[in-house]
């Protein structure tokens, strides 16, 4: 039993170390991006006449860099809150079938895939707003009406039954595991996807406020 407990602790340390590594890399990417001529910042440059230079056209490179920025932001914002769920899942999976580190990592992968999907959607939305002339170089909406509508919608959404249902599953590891448990590797990935969807259901409107505040 002592050896088994030691293996469980070792697996949990690996999971925590990997999550911290992802968050650290994401933070470093965002910090480094502040000093790089990222496409989103090019529109802030001034030419010789003191006039702002227009932001560059959307290319595959700009899309990928913007996607990386969004994904890094999602990682640093959402992974810390997912750690308790991942560790709780790991402890339950260990009791059911040891070792479970592979399934725990599949759970984490499913969770991150949801936020990757959201990041792709955010880039598409950013592209649409930019093409419509509704986005400033600081990534803020230039339309007061649109900003107001997003703020009101985000506030109202907090009181909906959908938000509350998602919140119960997202913030309570015990409730989620008891109602959403799936066995095996495929089940671990599916649970990660489900947990990610529930957490996305809690936060997606709040994430859109990034377009209001920049």
Predicted regions and their residues:
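Histidine-/acidic- and/or cysteine-rich, low-complexity loops and terminal segments associated
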Residues: 1-71, 95-96, 134-139, 160-182
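Juxtamembrane transmembrane-helix termini in multi-pass membrane transport proteins
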Residues: 2-5, 58, 67-112
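Residue-level signature of transmembrane alpha-helical entry/exit and packing/kink sites
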Residues: 15-19, 62-66, 103, 107, ...
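Divalent metal-coordination and catalytic microenvironments
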Residues: 38, 77, 109, 152, ...
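Alpha-helical transmembrane segments
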Residues: 61-76, 140-156
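A small-residue-rich subset of transmembrane alpha-helices
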Residues: 98-128, 202-214
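Transmembrane alpha-helix/helix-exit interface in multi-pass inner-membrane proteins
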Residues: 116-134, 144-172
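Alpha-helical transmembrane segments of helical membrane proteins, especially in multi-pass transport
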Residues: 155-165, 187, 191-212
């Amino acid at each position: 039993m002592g050896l088994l407990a030691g293996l469980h602790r070792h697996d949990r340390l690996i999971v925590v170390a990997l999550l911290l590594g992802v968050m650290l890399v994401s933070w470093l990417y965002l910090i480094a991006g502040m000093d790089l001529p990222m496409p989103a910042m090019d529109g802030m440059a001034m030419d010789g006449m003191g006039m702002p230079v227009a932001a560059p056209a959307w290319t595959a490179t700009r899309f990928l860099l913007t996607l990386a920025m969004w994904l890094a932001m999602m990682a640093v914002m959402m992974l810390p809150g997912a750690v308790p769920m991942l560790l709780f899942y790991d402890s339950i999976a260990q009791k059911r079938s040891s070792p479970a580190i592979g399934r725990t990592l599949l759970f984490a992968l499913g969770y991150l895939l949801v936020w990757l999907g959201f990041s792709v959607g955010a880039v598409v939305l950013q592209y649409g707003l930019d093409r419509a002339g509704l986005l400033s170089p600081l990534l803020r909406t230039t339309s007061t009406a649109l900003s107001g509508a997003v703020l009101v919608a985000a506030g109202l959404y907090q009181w909906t039954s959908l938000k509350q249902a998602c919140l119960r599953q997202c913030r309570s590891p015990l409730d989620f595991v008891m109602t959403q448990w799936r066995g095996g590797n495929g089940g671990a990935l599916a649970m990660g996807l489900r947990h990610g969807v529930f957490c996305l259901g809690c936060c997606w409107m709040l994430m859109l406020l990034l377009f209001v505040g920049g």
